[in-house]
Every structure is written in structure tokens, then in C-alpha cells.
Amino acid sequence: MKKPITAQSLRRTNVLAGILHLAQMAAVLALSSDFSLPITATYMAGPPGSTFAAPVVLFNTPVGLTVAIFLGLSALAHFIVASPQFFGRYSAGIAAQRNYFRWVEYAVSSSVMIVLIAQVTGVSDISAIISLFGVNASMILFGWLQEKYETPGNGGWLPFIFGCIAGIVPWVALVFYVFSIGGVEETSAPAFVYGIVFTIFSFFNSFALVQWLQYKKVGKWSDYIRGERTYITLSLIAKSALAWQIFANTLIPS
């Protein structure tokens, strides 16, 4: 017989997840090369619609540090909710079928992840990077609104639907770069880029699936606390998958 999931067992799960995220962050920082990707801007060199100046590199993003940031953010969030100062608020939120801590962390960490994926596929323009970050964060915040204003089983889905609409936008943009739509014939993404995009796209959608199952009250998912543990597990797996796919293909010192 399976043990029931309790607030205290979730506390231990958060501590373990925090340790695993932190250990991976330290490993990435210790083992990574100084590989970086550019952030660029293209400015007008004449009237609108005429000519543009050559793209300029505004700065370079250290990829190893970016990976460490989203791992570190997750570690920090897990340790915060497990701490004596915040665990009471966290467990009360879980009992009320909401976890606002989750949405704050995801809004930042998953947006850093989508920006990194975009850069790996070839997106470098500063306006595109900012837009992708903002749209992805909006998707997460709609998930927050779903929990704030709706309850599982009440049939309210508007924030969830808006979140799905916002969430698909970055992936539509990435398709153009991954498959070189409209590009010259010689342009193509490396094989590992396809793997990263497919893997993380699948994980991102699995988070939406968990919320859908919770709010439809499907089987075991009618127990909100089970969904919370699933979110923790998915977050760890998704971030680990992206971190080590990036490391294996771009960050191993030569």
C-alpha cells in the first residue's frame, strides 16, 4: 500500500529537489567552458522599410552561467518553501489547492530556459529575446490566475486557455529557426538542437497537462497534493534534461 502524500513528505521532497538542483548548478559551473552566445540588435540606416545597418553585438550570454541560473533559481525556491519561515504558508496553500511560490519561480526559471533554447536555435535579436521571455512569463502567470480564481472541478478554464495561447507562441517562433523556414538551402540546425526543442517542448506541455488533470479532477489527480509532487518531479527532470543536453553539446571544454 502506498504511503499517503503529506505536507511533511512534500517538505522532504522539496529539500531533496533543492539539493539535486544545487548540485547540478555547481557541477555545471565547475565543468563548463566559457562558451557564450551573442545578443544582437539591428538598427535602421535610413527611412523605415529601406536599409538596415549590420547587426551589432550588444553583449554575449555565458551559456554555462545561464544554465546555472535556472538551476539555482529552482534550488532557491525549493529551499524557501521548505524553510521554517515559509513552510507554514506553503503547506496552507497546498491545503487550499494553490501554490503561488511555484508560479513565481516558474515565471522566471522557465523563461530563462526558453530564452536559452531560442539562443541555441539561432535567435539573437534583443527584441525577440525580451519578447520570448515576456510571453513565456505571461503563460506561467495565467497558470497562477487559474489557481487564484478557479477551483478544481468548477468548470472555469479561461486563465488556462489564455495561458495555452500565450505558451505556444515561443514554440511557433522557434519552429522558423529550427527548420530554417524561408532560409537558404544550406542552413540547418544541428541534430542536438532538434533533440533539445522536442524534449523541452514535451516537458513544457506536461506541466499544462498536470493542471488540466487537476482541474478536471481525473482519477488520482483529484488529489491536489499529488499534482504538487508531480510538478516538483517534472521541474527537476525538465531542468536537468536541458542543462545536460546543453552541457554535452556546447559546454564541454575542448
PLM features per residue range, with description:
Residues 2-99, 110-254:
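Polytopic alpha-helical membrane-helix bundles and their juxtamembrane interface segments
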